[in-house]
């Protein structure tokens, strides 16, 4: 998909750059593959804000996506490519030979009419899924499981991918886009190719309203607040805050390490590249 550049015929179109979605399906999703979705507005079950600057946005239906790809050796044909308001990547509606319909993450270079299949001994081509132990070293993959049968967890956003760089003692060595190199069990499934919509990160929304349609509210800086509202607030005139970046509750942020899962530290060969913190 290409990018659409708009002429500045109105103030809000000046500088606007959006993904051209003209090749995607223009109708509604398959009703049997959708569920109701209630907007939380960034609140938890106590009604307290757990994620700031969320709320509003267009009403959505959740598309049930098959992240597990455990229907082995049954070929499926790509019926259409669809937009999904719940994620940055596009979806592919596939129809199996037995008539079952399913949504999968659409990889790059997957077209309507293509055939995809999951299994141990299948071709290495975009959209096919197989265990990491059966994938050749050097292959670009996405939708990678961390636990066998739990469904893909890594490399699911638009344009993302990981690379299989080695295999050893039942584990696969996978290099992620963050620079992290980690071990994943060879039985875990992964899909071939990179995720669709790589131009998602190159969009310029052009106006605040388009951000509101996506459910994002205005983001207020801590240094622009009063001392009662934020550790960086206050000061006569504009200040730089006077201390390292912190959350409204005083915890270090912007690069400070927060990973606490020591149980799987041994599976990380090289940590991801991080900034200062």
Curated annotation (Swiss-Prot):
Where does the source fall among the domains of life? Bacteria
| Keywords from the named record | Ribonucleoprotein, Ribosomal protein, RNA-binding, rRNA-binding
Q: Which GO terms describe its biological process?
A: cytoplasmic translation
Which Gene3D superfamilies does UniProt cross-reference here? 2.30.30.30, Nucleic acid-binding proteins, Ribosomal protein L2, domain 3
Where is the segment annotated Disordered? 216-277
Q: Cellular component per GO? A: large ribosomal subunit
Q: Which GO terms describe its molecular function?
A: rRNA binding; structural constituent of ribosome; transferase activity
Question: Which region is the signal sequence?
Answer: none
Q: How does it assemble?
A: Part of the 50S ribosomal subunit. Forms a bridge to the 30S subunit in the 70S ribosome.
| Matches recorded under PANTHER family | LARGE RIBOSOMAL SUBUNIT PROTEIN UL2M, RIBOSOMAL PROTEIN L2
The record's similarity note reads:
Belongs to the universal ribosomal protein uL2 family.
Its function? One of the primary rRNA binding proteins. Required for association of the 30S and 50S subunits to form the 70S ribosome, for tRNA binding and peptide bond formation. It has been suggested to have peptidyltransferase activity; this is somewhat controversial. Makes several contacts with the 16S rRNA in the 70S ribosome.
Question: Can you name this protein?
Answer: Large ribosomal subunit protein uL2
In which organism is this protein found? Acidiphilium cryptum (strain JF-5)
Taxonomic classification, please? Bacteria, Pseudomonadati, Pseudomonadota, Alphaproteobacteria, Acetobacterales
Name of the encoding gene:
rplB
């Amino acid at each position: 998909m290409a990018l659409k550049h708009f002429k500045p015929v109105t103030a809000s179109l000046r500088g606007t750059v959006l993904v051209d979605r003209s090749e995607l399906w223009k109708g509604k999703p398959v009703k049997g593959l959708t569920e109701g979705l209630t907007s939380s507005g960034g609140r938890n079950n106590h009604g307290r804000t757990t994620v700031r600057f969320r709320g509003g946005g267009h009403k959505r239906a959740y598309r049930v996506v098959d992240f597990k790809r455990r229907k082995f050796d049954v070929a499926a044909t790509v019926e259409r490519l669809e937009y999904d308001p719940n994620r940055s990547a596009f979806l592919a509606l596939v129809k199996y030979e037995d008539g079952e319909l399913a949504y999968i993450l659409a990889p790059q270079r997957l077209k309507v009419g293509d055939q995809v299949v999951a299994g141990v001994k299948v071709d290495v081509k975009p959209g096919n899924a197989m265990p990491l132990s059966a994938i050749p070293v050097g292959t670009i993959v996405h939708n990678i499981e961390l636990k066998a049968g739990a469904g893909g967890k890594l490399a699911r956003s638009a344009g993302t991918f990981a690379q299989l760089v080695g295999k050893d003692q039942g584990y696969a060595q996978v290099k992620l886009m963050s620079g992290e190199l980690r071990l994943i069990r060879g039985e875990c499934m992964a899909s071939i190719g990179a995720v669709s919509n790589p131009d998602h990160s190159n969009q310029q929304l052009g106006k605040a309203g388009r951000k509101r349609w996506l459910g994002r509210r205005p983001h207020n800086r801590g240094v622009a607040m009063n001392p009662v509202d934020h550790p960086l607030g206050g000061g006569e005139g504009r200040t730089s805050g006077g201390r390292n970046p912190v959350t409204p509750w005083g915890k270090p942020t912007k690069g400070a390490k927060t990973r606490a899962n020591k149980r799987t530290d041994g599976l990380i060969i090289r940590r991801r590249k991080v900034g200062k913190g």
